[in-house]
Amino acid sequence: MSEAKRLAAEKAIEYVEDGMIVGVGTGSTVAYFIDALARIQHRIKGAVSSSEQSTARLKQHGIEVIELNHSGNLSLYVDGADECDANKCLIKGGGAALTREKIIAEASERFICIVDPSKQVPVLGKFPLPVEVIPMARSLIARQIRDMTGGQPTWREGVVTDNGNQILDIHNLQITDPEKLERELNQLPGVVCVGLFARRRADVVIVGGEPPVVL
């Protein structure tokens, strides 16, 4: 699948325009995008990064990393996904960067999601849904989510997000109404961010292949 990821990332470069500050996500597919972006870095002003991992890779290539507080709204955000449905709703957060990813997506006029074909699903939920939580609320939220959804929350032990929080992964879900579940989970006290990107879903999905498919 690495070649499919690379092809999706290369296709996304076509959406980068001169003078842009580009929002950059996190993950293995985005790593290919950062590498491709490095080849045209003379055309862009810099990048807003969603994680320390992506920041390090951008800086390795000499791409200027700009804080979102200083960049203002962005024209373009490119990120991957753990799952993607036919309506361009996503599950994200396998790399634990979901909160910053969602913030940058919200700040961006256009959100391009780059995936390999294995990430396309008819119904979201086979991939465990990540939820970033305040540490003291972890057990409470796990019980509430179990009661609310029937899913099985597990604590991603040993993982601390860039924001200093913890991750619950919710297994055994069939998410037929992603926007509703995103809204309901967001209302639980102690939830920082839900890894459902439904209210702010992708505008374009690029599925890597020969040739890449643009949805």
Swiss-Prot record:
Reactions listed under catalytic activity: aldehydo-D-ribose 5-phosphate = D-ribulose 5-phosphate
EC number(s) per entry: 5.3.1.6
The protein's enzyme class: isomerase
Domain of life: Bacteria
GO terms for MF: ribose-5-phosphate isomerase activity
InterPro entries (UniProt xref): NagB/RpiA_transferase-like, Ribose5P_isomerase_typA_subgr, Ribose5P_isomerase_type_A
Entry-linked CDD domains: RPI_A (cd01398)
Pfam families assigned: Rib_5-P_isom_A
GO biological processes: D-ribose metabolic process; pentose-phosphate shunt, non-oxidative branch
Pathway this chain belongs to: Carbohydrate degradation; pentose phosphate pathway; D-ribose 5-phosphate from D-ribulose 5-phosphate (non-oxidative stage): step 1/1
Residues forming the catalytic site: 101 (proton acceptor)
Keyword annotations of the record: Isomerase
Cellular component annotations (GO), alphabetically ordered: cytosol
HAMAP family documented for this protein: Rib_5P_isom_A (MF_00170)
Function statement: Catalyzes the reversible conversion of ribose-5-phosphate to ribulose 5-phosphate.
Assembly with partners or alone: Homodimer.
Entry similarity comment: Belongs to the ribose 5-phosphate isomerase family.
Name this polypeptide is given: Ribose-5-phosphate isomerase A
Naturally occurring in which organism (per UniProt): Stenotrophomonas maltophilia (strain R551-3)
